[in-house]
Amino acid sequence: MINDIQKTAEGKMQRSVEVLKENLAKVRTGRAHTGLLDQVEVEYWGSMVPVSQVANVTLLDARTIGVKPFEGNMAAKVEKAIRDSNLGLNPAAVGDLIRVPMPMLTEERRKDLIKVVRGEAEEGRVSIRNVRRDANDHIKKLLKDKEISEDEARRGEEAVQKLTDKYIAEADKVLAAKEEDLMAV
């Protein structure tokens, strides 16, 4: 019974760390990556679709994304969608290739982004702690209903605490890597 609670808690904690990684990946650094354009949508035959469905998105170099539409007539629409995306990007069409250079981040902007990243990491840690609280509440309920002994309850809570420490450390590691990435010039 305690093992089921631990497995459930570990799965939820792992998911919290995954969500944190996904959220931090959306924060733009000075380095180019194709995932940056994932949320940019362009109109295609009357419906809005992600850029990746109407164009080939590649890295030209560490600071430039290349976007090559599958159909030549889509280049202007794709360029406009990227420009209007609120990502602070300024694409330039060169023939049928759209070059998207990554602007340099100012020191002030880097510090603002670090604050955002730290906030996201704290949300991840809170989520992990909430999973711990739920698991401990479940263990206490089993103890109250006399389904487990006090020793089993204590061991269960200690195991859940170890899981919590492990996943909070992992969240901190993810945060440190992102901060380092942001501060790299």
Curated annotation (Swiss-Prot):
A GO term for molecular function: ribosomal large subunit binding
Subcellular location field: Cytoplasm
Keywords: Cytoplasm, Protein biosynthesis
A GO-annotated cellular component: cytosol
Pfam families tied to this protein: RRF
Disulfide bonds: none
Major localization class: cytoplasm
HAMAP family xref list: RRF
Cross-referenced NCBIfam families: frr
Sequence similarity: Belongs to the RRF family.
Protein name, per record: Ribosome-recycling factor
